Amino acid sequence: MSKEPQTGVDGQINMPIFPLRTVLFPGGILPLRIFEPRYVDMIRWCMREQATFGVVLLRQGSEVNTPAGAAGNDRELFKIGTEAEIIDFNQADNGLLGIVAQGRRKFSIVDTNEKKDGLLLASVQYLPEEAVGELTDEHETLVTVLKDLLQHPLIQQLNPEVDLQQARSVSYRLADLLPLEPEIKQALLQMNWPKERLSELRRLVGKFRG
């Protein structure tokens, strides 16, 4: 279990940021293959210190190394991300570092500092934990869709945690597992209420079904 990140002023938390074209939800499972030296160093530091890091969606720019001051360094991030805890790791034969991270709490970026190698360090503020919420009959279709997704062999390998009785858990896992564009997933992540997220998911699932 990871220890608590270092707390700064006004309850802000300091953590390294991993910008990706992927959205991580609380409780979600994220396998990663790490090859860039800056992120290899970051992950090894996190494992050594039992620290967490932040996953934030790239609004624009590249995941690939663009050091500060380099031409084309136009990286821009969304402000809301998710704290990630490393729950497994391995060293592949090709030298790549493989990890499995699990989403914990949502946060908002207050400020960032970019190192010379392009690694982002951020001061973040945790967002209030969402209410668990209750499911109703109108959510029955969404629960069925989620159950079907959980039977997929690739998803079973990830073994995501889900409580099919909780609105928050169902909304997070559906948003996580449905094949949606990253920006749509980001909009779902930024919602503060499970019922609001479930309502939007009902609309999206309805579009899938024509």
Regions picked out by a protein language model, each given a short descriptive name:
Residues A187-L188, K195:
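Charged low-complexity "KEKE/polyampholyte" interaction tracts
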